[in-house]
Structures are given as C-alpha cells and as structure tokens.
Regions:
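ATP-dependent carboxylate-amine ligase
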Residues: 1-104
C-alpha cells in the first residue's frame, strides 16, 4: 500500500535505523510533505532534506518534498499543520488524509 501524499513522521526515540529506506519509499510513492515531530525532530528533518537532495554525482535529480519539524509541539499539532498544506504540496488529492508513520 502506498503512503499518503502528506505524512507526519512521529519519532518515539532518537533511533534512526531504517530512516533512509523509509524516505526512499516516501519518494517512490509520491509523498509531497513530511512533518517531523518528537525527539530530535529538527535533526531528522535535515536528514530527510539531504536524502531528498540525493547524491552529488548527478545520478538522481533532487526530489521536491516540503518538510517541517515540530519541536515542542504535539502530534496533534503536527497533524493539524499538515492538514492545512495546500498547493503543490497538498498530496495526491485535495482533502487527502494525513498519514502518521511512527519510527522508533
């Protein structure tokens, strides 16, 4: 099953195992927005951005994904923020749900 166009990545720990492949899956499925909430969310947002940029050797074009981090905010706040994203980053279809993916 493909991921929704907008995802909130809910971190329960600072563990990053599997993050690279998860973001690759998001890109494969056409995810347009990822909001990150939980421990280390600011650093994890940066990692997501670097993965989307891709390798510097030109073997892949950068992937256009909007990201945000929600330090000191609740999961519900991050979901509410994601629900209000519109335009190019609104997801596959207007009004599409926000999917919460838990890591850690």
């Amino acid at each position: 099953m493909a991921y929704a166009g907008k995802v909130v990545l809910h971190l329960r720990s600072t563990e990053r195992q599997g993050l690279d492949s998860l973001i690759e899956d998001f890109m494969r499925d056409g995810v347009r927005f990822v909001g990150v909430v939980g421990p280390d969310c600011v650093d994890i947002e940066d990692v997501v951005d670097w993965i989307c940029l891709g390798p510097c050797d030109g073997t892949r074009e950068p992937y256009d994904m909007l990201t945000s981090s929600h330090d000191d905010e609740s999961l519900e706040d991050a979901i509410s923020f994601a629900e209000r994203i519109t335009g190019n980053y609104q997801g596959h279809a207007f009004g599409e749900r926000v999917e919460v993916v838990t890591l850690g």
